């Protein structure tokens, strides 16, 4: 896959930090980078993997959300990075179990951690974007991904976003470039 966001950001010297637990580490690295195993620029990219617990997800639905957030907030407040991404796997992985009580706990765990992330974002006057690539925790009777629309939440941004039916995940990369003051390349469509 060509023209990934990380490739574009590295061209502009943007320092990146990616973190998740083992269950979704590949999603913030390999898949995020267009199925590429190696970094585009070793000096600009930092990857952190929090080891996942080896227990059924419904037995520990909070997973490693707190540990991810500890490192995430540290990275945000450090001032060492211009763009930070994470993946909290709780809604997806616990949602696959089909256990509604466990899924609720998993999602509530992420809610609690996002409150901590917001505190760190506020300290540095940053912008927080929250989205997902699919639904899963939104339909208790299914253990597969749903077709439900996913949110795209912008926190603390002094901007106006377009609204429309033709906008979606394909617009996220250009929007990130815009927030960073970069002109998105012709392959990235802006929200």
Task: Show where each model-derived region lies.
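Feature captures the catalytic ectodomains and active-site-proximal regions of enzymes
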Residues: 1-191
């Amino acid at each position: 896959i060509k023209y990934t966001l990380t490739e574009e950001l590295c061209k502009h010297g943007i320092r990146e930090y990616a973190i998740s637990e083992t269950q979704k580490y590949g999603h913030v690295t390999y898949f995020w980078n267009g199925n590429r195993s190696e970094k585009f620029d070793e000096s600009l990219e930092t990857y952190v993997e929090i080891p996942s617990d080896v227990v059924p997800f419904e037995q520990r639905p909070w997973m490693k959300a707190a540990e991810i957030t500890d490192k995430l907030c540290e990275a945000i407040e450090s001032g060492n990075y211009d763009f930070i991404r994470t993946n909290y796997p709780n809604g997806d992985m616990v949602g696959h179990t089909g256990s509604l009580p466990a899924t609720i706990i998993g999602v509530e765990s992420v809610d609690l951690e996002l409150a901590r992330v917001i505190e760190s974002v506020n300290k540095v006057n940053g912008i927080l974007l929250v989205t997902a690539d699919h639904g899963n925790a939104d339909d208790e009777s299914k253990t597969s991904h749903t077709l439900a629309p996913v949110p795209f939440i912008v926190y603390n941004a002094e901007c106006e976003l377009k609204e429309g039916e033709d906008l979606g995940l394909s617009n996220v990369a250009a929007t990130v470039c815009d927030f960073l003051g970069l002109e998105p390349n012709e392959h990235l469509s802006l929200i």
